[in-house]
Swiss-Prot record:
Protein family membership: Belongs to the metallo-dependent hydrolases superfamily. Adenine deaminase family.
Domain of life: Bacteria
Pfam name, any one: Adenine_deam_C
PANTHER family xrefs: ADENINE DEAMINASE, N-ACETYLGLUCOSAMINE-6-PHOSPHATE DEACETYLASE
Biological-process GO terms, alphabetical: adenine catabolic process
EC number of the protein: 3.5.4.2
UniProt keyword annotations, A-Z: Hydrolase, Manganese
Record's protein name: Adenine deaminase
Top-level enzyme category: hydrolase
Alphabetized InterPro entries for the sequence: Adenine_deam, Adenine_deam_C, Amidohydro-rel, Metal-dep_hydrolase_composite, Metal_Hydrolase
Catalyzed reactions per annotation: adenine + H2O + H(+) = hypoxanthine + NH4(+)
Gene Ontology molecular function terms on file: adenine deaminase activity
Annotated organism of origin: Escherichia coli O139:H28 (strain E24377A / ETEC)
Transit peptide listed as a keyword: no
Length: 588
């Protein structure tokens, strides 16, 4: 854990220090003083009464001794509870289908003042140009948008076709950027454990920063070896004892509650007063509908308090201070002298009801963020352009031949989890011996002209129609699920025509579709409009059967080979436990 003061992120000049000290001593006028407020004490528990004094971007003082201090402006908190700004320890903003600018507009008023993001979705499509755009957005953001340098592009070498590479030389060019906090999730855990030099070179190059992990279900000697390599955290844990063992071995545990992977209920019982400095909250992948209707990190805090009886100071600790310490962001995470004034005022701390947000010492106005969004997005120079180099397809492209009496592998979906099971089904003249089997295909979209890779999917709940998307981790080829080849072709051709996006087909017609013009991943619409479009897509998808809560996000992970057990990439069926390709027909 990188819990030493990292001066790379603590940008304060000597002149600012002198001004801050003068206000702290009571010799100068503060910019803001927040009165009538109680401060939640994340270290000792309980509350601290008294004003919060702000000079510039920083807190100059806290407590009753500043009751009569002068200020240019006073903020009446009306009895609110003040907590540090919330921090998401690991996410891919692209998975929200919002640009970083729009994401800030949607989440900053909810108290999310800091994000640690890995832009490997757009980097897999566009390479370094995608990372550079995220860096430009981070530089101009009010929200603290920090970047982990994407480590595995593609997720697993030789297992899929993606749009670009991201070499170690290119990665090193970004290592010293002021918004970079470390190396993003090292997904090829098998390669790390076996000591592949190319992967160890990446770890060595970023060892002075934070090294993110990714090791779902890993245990035993393999987990020990992965941690020995220097990996510091994991956001992929989905079982209680798995999380406990990782904590015992010195890993920090990121408790994830995204739109598809929902691990909070399984892992929240681990959190206690002792280990909470090693526990963090993250969303990984969360869609705009859930952000609008349920919230972001604020929703996770609320559930910790209401459903798992986590004490207030511990719940807010894992949502801020623990993450700040882990990433060496020691100017964040506490409401204390010298810390950055990222403050969330709560009218109800148990319900996480946000009354007002300040970031870098300035109050945030949601309407101003919305009004400025279009201009700020244009200023960031988004990488527009069609990234779909694929010709339209026909139903014959999805034709599969099955032999009666033979057994075939089926990717079995677990609703609200990213892992799958590998099962099999026997084919007869009447079809398969289970009625929930549909077809799945992945089509590379980067001009390689490969035939679609086809397979079978169980447990998804699709009774009719087809769903297609260009959001399919991590290479973001076209993934389609359907009950008929004709409707699969129709759905795929719609997302090709849109230049990337999502589509629902039923009764031989397109029922709903959403173009995603930036890399086939992100929309330029407002968060509100995007949430409405997602709502329409989900409504259309529900007509196709009892699908997962977030069908498109769940579908997007069916092509990710670094999460077990059975996945489908543009190259074919992949066994995520053996880290090897396998066949559709079971012959062993």
């Amino acid at each position: 854990m990188n819990n030493s003061i990292n001066h790379k992120f603590h940008h304060i000049s000597r002149a600012e220090y002198q001004e801050l000290l003068a206000v702290s001593r009571g010799d100068a006028v503060a910019d803001y003083i927040i009165d009538n407020v109680s401060i939640l004490d994340l270290i000792n528990g309980g509350e601290i009464s008294g004003p919060i004094v702000i000079k510039g971007r920083y807190i100059a003082g806290v407590g009753a001794e500043y009751a009569d201090a002068p200020a240019l402006q006073r903020i009446d908190a009306r009895g609110a509870t003040a907590v540090p700004g919330f921090i998401d320890a690991h996410l891919h903003i692209e998975s929200s289908m919002m640009t970083p600018v729009t994401f800030e507009t949607a989440t900053l008023p909810r108290g999310l003042t800091t994000v640690i993001c890995d832009p490997h979705e757009i980097v897999n499509v566009m390479g370094e140009a995608g990372f550079a755009w995220f860096a430009r957005c981070a530089e101009q953001a009010r929200q603290n948008q920090y970047l982990q340098v994407s480590s595995c592009v593609p997720a697993l070498e030789g297992c899929d076709v993606n749009g670009a590479s991201f070499t170690l030389e290119q990665m090193l060019a970004w290592r010293d950027h002021p918004q970079v906090t470390g190396l993003a999730e090292m997904m090829d855990y098998s390669g790390v454990i076996s000591g592949q030099n190319a992967l160890l070179d990446k770890l060595d190059a970023f060892r002075h920063l934070t090294l993110d992990g990714h090791c779902p279900g890993l245990g035993g000697k393999e987990l020990n070896a992965y941690i020995t390599a220097g990996i510091e955290n994991c956001h992929e844990s989905y079982q209680l004892e798995e999380g406990r063992r990782k904590l015992q071995l010195g890993m920090s545990l990121m408790i994830r509650e995204g739109s598809a992977a929902r691990n909070l209920n399984a892992l929240a019982p681990l959190i206690n007063e002792f280990n909470s400095p090693q526990c963090m909250l993250c969303t990984d992948d969360r869609n705009p509908w859930e952000i609008a209707h349920e919230g972001h990190i604020d929703a996770l805090i609320r559930r910790l308090i209401e459903q798992h009886n986590v004490p207030l100071h511990v719940a807010y600790r894992v949502a801020s201070w623990s993450t700040a310490r882990h990433f060496g962001l020691n100017h964040l995470g506490l409401l204390a002298p010298g810390k950055q004034a990222d403050i969330v005022l709560l009218s109800d701390a148990r319900k996480v009801t946000v009354q007002q947000v300040l970031v870098k010492g300035e109050p945030i106005d949601a309407q101003t963020l919305q009004a400025e969004e279009s201009a700020r997005l244009a200023q960031s120079a988004p990488p527009y352009g069609n990234t779909i180099a694929r010709q339209p397809v026909s139903a014959s492209d999805f034709a599969l031949q099955f032999t009666p009496g033979k057994r075939y592998r089926v990717i079995d979906v677990i609703h609200n989890e990213l892992i799958t099971h590998s099962h099999s089904s026997v084919y007869s003249e009447n079809g398969f011996d289970r009625d929930d089997v549909s077809f799945i295909a992945v089509l590379e979209r980067y001009g390689q002209r490969l035939a679609p890779a086809c397979g079978l999917l169980g447990g998804f709940g699709l009774n009719e129609g087809a769903l297609a998307a260009t959001v399919s981790h991590d290479s973001h080829n076209i993934v389609v699920i359907g009950r008929s080849a004709e409707e699969m072709a129709l759905a795929v051709n719609q997302v090709i025509q849109d230049g990337g996006g999502l589509c629902v087909v039923r009764n031989g017609q397109v029922q709903s579709h959403l173009p995603l013009p930036i890399a086939g991943l992100m929309s330029t619409d407002t968060a509100q409009l995007l949430a409405e479009q997602i709502d329409a897509l989900k409504a259309a998808a529900r007509e196709c059967g009892p699908l997962p809560d977030e069908p498109f996000i769940q579908m997007a992970f069916l092509s990710l080979p670094v999460i077990p057990a059975l996945k489908l990439t543009s190259q074919g069926l992949f066994d995520g436990e053996k880290f090897a390709f396998t066949t559709l027909e079971v012959t062993e």
